[in-house]
Amino acid sequence: MDIFDIIGPVMVGPSSSHTAGAVRIGYISQKLMGEQIKEANILLYGSFLDTGKGHGTNKAIVAGLLGMQPDDMRIPHSMEIAEKKGIKVTFGKSTLKEAHPNSAQIILTGISGKQLEVVGESLGGSRINIAQIDGITTNFSGDYPTLVVHNQDQPGHVSEVTSMLAHKSVNIASMQLYRSNRGGNAVMVLECDQEIPREGIESVSYTH
């Protein structure tokens, strides 16, 4: 079971959708990755593809992948910073079907060889939605302390995670379960009212 925890408008312009939202998509993607990024293939869709370069969408996503927030003054220089860090960044056109017009498909490779694919949507006003993780449909914003669990669809995983949160006095605000198919890959998203202690996350991760 892989465990990821995330996140939870001041911005460097010009657009809340194309810049602030794009930074947040990149930021959540690198949190989900959980290790240093070696390569990032960023595929843009719709308005992101058509007008994103002029609005700095490409630099904004890379800034988020570097751990920057929307108000970070280094955003315009994110490409140079990524190059200095040895991160290979490429851009292309996404082949997503019927996606939100401000969508980015981000394919990451970490230093261990781990790969992750995230599809994020920028909804305006710096609001975003993470629509897919590794091809599995999801729906969360990262506005709350959020625990994302990537596991096999088998009995016991849900109760293990919820028991850990109860033991740490963390209240679950919402919980969503997604799976590719019965017994296949699954994603559990738990938005919480409190920050999730690191030792709680590790206690679940180390049992698998």
Where are these regions (language model features)?
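Short amphipathic alpha-helix segments
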Residues: 124, 153-172
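Regulatory modules associated with amino-acid/nitrogen control
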Residues: 7-12, 20, 25-148, 154-155
